[in-house]
Amino acid sequence: MFDSTLNPLWQRYILAVQEEVKPALGCTEPISLALAAAVAAAELEGPVERVEAWVSPNLMKNGLGVTVPGTGMVGLPIAAALGALGGNANAGLEVLKDATAQAIADAKALLAAGKVSVKIQEPCDEILFSRAKVWNGEKWACVTIVGGHTNIVHIETHNGVVFTQQACVTEGEQESPLTVLSRTTLAEILKFVNEVPFAAIRFILDSAKLNCALSQEGLSGNWGLHIGATLEKQCARGLLAKDLSSSIVIRTSAASDARMGGATLPAMSNSGSGNQGITATMPVVVVAEHFGADDERLARALMLSHLSAIYIHNQLPRLSALCAATTAAMGAAAGMAWLVDGRYETISMAISSMIGDVSGMICDGASNSCAMKVSTSASAAWKAVLMALDDTAVTGNEGIVAHDVEQSIANLCALASHSMQQTDRQIIEIMASKAR
């Protein structure tokens, strides 16, 4: 798989990126449930007549208000129904890519007939949990996903257990590539980006290809809140300058508009999130184009952005009350700073300023308004880079920012992992009361 001469640590970095940066069609929380339903349907004897599903509170939060691609409908029930009737059980986060018009119509009919239910799993200690049970008469099949959007841990039918994931790693098995990130630093990541052979990371250019196509769709269609298209119109009207700063925000938010509005184009995700992938990709692409960067330079900047975003997010719960577009934008800040300046000091200063700026942004579920937060995060990232280029940054004398960027990241992630859990519960309670 790798050149045998490649640094083993670098191999783990590349594996981590390949594991966390993947194409995804539709918001990944509803898609996780759709995948569970699709796999269950593949195990069922006969056509699906009824769907029952249970999800964690966090997954419910991120599925209440998001449009499922191709359906024009929001919410988890349509995702579960379409996954069961038209999903590709082998396609992972692109489970709905082959859904036909007939499958969509059948899913809507199943929903209208009251044959689909989605409830919160109680009790539930897992942050990311989805279980789908499909029925044909008295026959049934059930699939459970835990911990990761595609991490199937249990498959069972009326005939018995088909599959159960082993909880422990046996001797001889390799640890997850993500484990290495808990033992690395941004400085080591930068060394990797500067020195790794281009051929080993060329694949990351696919993130630019997919997310640029999504951005163009967002600008040409009436998706979501159409923030990108609206800002572009304001440039034409003379109310907003058409410059590098506005281009970063417009093209990044346009991709999120299309993503959250239900466009049937995949995003290249990061850490299980399309919006995080968009945020880690598009600002870097825009700046690279501005400076006329070639493919190799773009690939190195994208690798720094995506790997830095993964590195930070690996210290967070998979889902939390912290809007992770902000942490993905910290990766983007690193990638943009590298393109302009290349120095570790500039990169670390930009990330520190980001932590001092947007770290309080909450995640109140996946919806069209995510594009607002994506645009805010992208704008903050470029502002932080501009400050760092002038040797200015939020310092360790201010707020949760420390004198060392690694400690600043740890402080932010500690907030999200511990004290913001109560915030998360309050957000879920508010959203649940609206849905009643």
From Swiss-Prot:
One of its GO terms (molecular function) is L-cysteine desulfhydrase activity. Pfam families: SDH_alpha. GO terms for biological process: L-cysteine catabolic process to pyruvate. It comes from the Bacteria. Coiled coil: none annotated. Belongs to the UPF0597 family. PANTHER family: UPF0597 PROTEIN YHAM. This is UPF0597 protein YhaM. It comes from Escherichia coli O6:H1 (strain CFT073 / ATCC 700928 / UPEC).
